[in-house]
Amino acid sequence: MIINVDLHIHSHFSGATSTSMTIETLAREAPRKGIDVVATGDCLHSEWQREIKQCERIDEGTFLLGETRFILTTEVEDKNRVHHLLLFPSFSSVDDFKERITKFSSNIETDGRPNVSLNGEQIAEFAKDVDALIGPAHAFTPWTAMYAYHDSLSSCYGDLTRYISFLELGLSADSNYGDRISELHRLTFLTNSDAHSPYPVRLAREFNRMSVKEATYREIKNAILRKNGNSVTLNVGLPPQEGKYNESACISCFRHYTLDEAVKRRWRCICGGRIKKGVRDRVNELADLPVPKHPEYRPPYLHIIPLAEIIAKALGQNSTFTKKVTKRWTELVDAFGSEVNILLDADIEEISKVTVPAVTEAIKAFREGKVIIHPGGGGRYGTIELPNEEERDTVRDKQKTLSDFLKT
């Protein structure tokens, strides 16, 4: 069977998250985004564990509420500020891991994403001891990421490097970025939302499509490990330019710089602010290949833009959270079942019967690959621009649909 999976989110017990990130809200919103299985996130937190345990238990590591299945995950920050994503097979595994790291953390009961005074190798060793999967979260982001503080997997994970089975690309990178680095060719790439709110523009803005026997932790683990015929068949995510850190830019005024310009200015903007190195430039530093070389098993990468963002631009709204945007998003999802279906597969003529012409034209422009993206940087997301009439007539590569990948 084919499932869509988002393996990195946070609960309302993590810092800077929405109070709406409850298990009930996630269970309700995931199907509207087209997602079958969602990470719990924050599973080390005692109060969040109590919410998770309200769900029906399918097996030791899989839980069900409504139409949505959950698997146990958390993110932790090590002593070098590197973030690691962990997936657990059961609550007993979670409890065992928590017992081992509690003495190294001062906020394990107060923050869903705890800080621990251990390095990546030590955390990976504990993960291995409890049979949990572990890999770098948003690996290229210039804050709190592996490649922000290390130049290689082994620098981060030491003797446990071979135990690392996956790498989360993050919003500012895709497979073409990752596969310019040879040491990553053996790893499964994951594309996850890292959602801090359940809003349509956040939850499942990136997700993975997997071929599994059933929608359970064990089968998802086998897909990540590429065992027993299971696999990740598609990575779905933002174009890298939409990420907050794609290009090098000032974190104060968001002025963009080339790498040479930033170096000459000693990473100080003309406004006096700090220039933060972008993912594109960091990959260029790390890459040992001039162009990406994808291993045979690497799935295609499908770029999507959140539907709420497309609607907001079509309606001339400055925010994706306005009542007008929410109304149009809701009427489309109610009519076609999920955001993924609307963006990629639903008949455009049928869409035109449900929404206003401006939104229909915007979705059509996205499908035709005519949406213009202005890169993000310095902590500000990239922005999109809809084509003018002349640009609408320009022939470009058509946006692929999920059905194009059914045979992968």
Where are these regions (language model features)?
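Histidine/acidic-residue-rich catalytic or RNA/ligand-binding cores of hydrolases
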Residues: 15-17, 49-50, 144-150, 199-211
